[in-house]
């Protein structure tokens, strides 16, 4: 097997795009993934800072171009209205690169069963992340075992083919800032702790491989041209 390492260049929000035409320039420089917003409201879409606004006309134009170019569309940080309207405006598989399930933790960045089923119906994937407040609002549950429980919940709800990992490990957030990850998963070096928890829950090696990378890889192969 090939031992080549692949990297996807992505953008966590496109608020800096001055106009729709700049997307082509970014694509030409290698960008193959983007979310429309990082929580903020911008000229293309609304993130979680708004409860009322959604996808704009310019946002619909961007989505059309992303689909035509073969770019991965990421719904992480989009608010519920934008989430729904992106589904209405597109036809390709969609991803949430990092986020968890509201059923286990009712955090604003997590997703309802209805949203998870929408991802499944579009043959997409959600990546479960290890940020402690996204895992549980009860401190003793902010563990790698409960992170595995989020994966297990999603797998049982929409199928193991639609859940992956979106660790969202940030080694630098800004001067004096630190990220609060769950106990047992403080950095990428702790990844095997998560996989061990999945084994304890009865997941096969094949299913763990899907969760590790194969599910996202399936979507990438379908979209990227």
At which residue positions do the language-model features occur?
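Short acidic/histidine-rich active-site segments
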Residues: 158-184
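Mid-to-C-terminal alpha-helical segments outside catalytic/metal-binding sites
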Residues: 186-225
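Short, flexible active-site loop motifs that bind/organize anionic cofactors or intermediates
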Residues: 13, 106, 181, 198, ...
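Hydrophobic alpha-helical scaffolding
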Residues: 76, 105, 109, 140-144, ...
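Short glycine/threonine-rich loop-to-helix capping motif typified by GTGT followed
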Residues: 140, 175-184, 220-225
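Active-site micro-motifs of SAM-dependent methyltransferase domains
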Residues: 101, 171, 218
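Conserved active-site loop/cleft motifs that coordinate metal ions or position small ligands
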Residues: 127, 163-166, 207-212
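Extended, charged catalytic domains and RNA/DNA-binding interfaces, predominantly
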Residues: 1-129, 133-135, 148, 152-155, ...
